[in-house]
Amino acid sequence: LGEVVMAPEKVVPYFGTVDKPECHLLYNVTTMASTWHTVATKDVSLLRRQLDIISNLPRDYVCQNYLRCHDDIGWGLDYEYLENFGIQEVPHKKYLNDFLTGKYPNSFARGELYNDDPRLGDARLCGTTASLCGIERFGFEGNQEGVDKAVRYDITLHAFMLSQSGIPVIYSGDEIGQVNDYTYKDDPEKAADSRYLHRGNFDWKLAENRHDPATVQGKLFPALDKLEHIRTSHSVFNSNVPFHTIDTWDNSILAFVRENDEEKFIGIYNFSENDKVAWINEEDGMYTDLISGRELEAKGVQIPAFGCYWLCRSKK
């Protein structure tokens, strides 16, 4: 197991070769960071590029996929690619951090900086998935509509992570939507390290709410549990199954296809706060959304704000 913080195409040597493997499993740091970049920018271009690169790696190379972990989020993005869009590294990092710490106007995220270096204009980011998705902000404000949308986004981000090739990992507390733990500031041994913001003890009392559908936990926990069961019951999610991205003709919507001899899967993810249409055009019949059970064609798919679809069609 290894951790390499660099672009996917530069990770390949650390795996060794198929005949002579070195690392058998690597943290998928770049896709994680690119996911949060996409949350802040609402533009999937970079994330799609990451998936395109990974899709061309040998299937023997296995990644450990995650949204959050014990450590901070470092912005090791493909800045050479982003320069094609006029995006420069230092100001872009500042924007990402401003958005995800809630400083940017109308940001729903609540995080904190780690290792802030004003001289270099560089800093890393800390925070739980729930807080970065808006559950903390809207919960504090008593905005139920905002909370519901934030929970939907939390589920969508986990659905995206769970549909990638590799081994998915859900960070402790994310399954019940735990928000940031600011009590670390009261401990002299922890106060200087903002990573403790997302290292709070698992809240077992909060976890009891998972049986109440009116609560955040009662919406989030069953949804993630369902996604996990769907993933384990469909062979199309196996790591050896090839995948490729497809055009949606909307920069805020990501879609990719996984396909084997048994099934064809299309994952669609809306990173926008607005309802959208994914202008895909798969002309091979009806699909079933594995999440809702709804049947629909994979054409001009209407997708709610921060929503997702797991469309699947049996080939038997």
What is each residue range found by the language model?
Residues 1-316:
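Active-site and adjacent substrate-binding regions of carbohydrate-active enzymes
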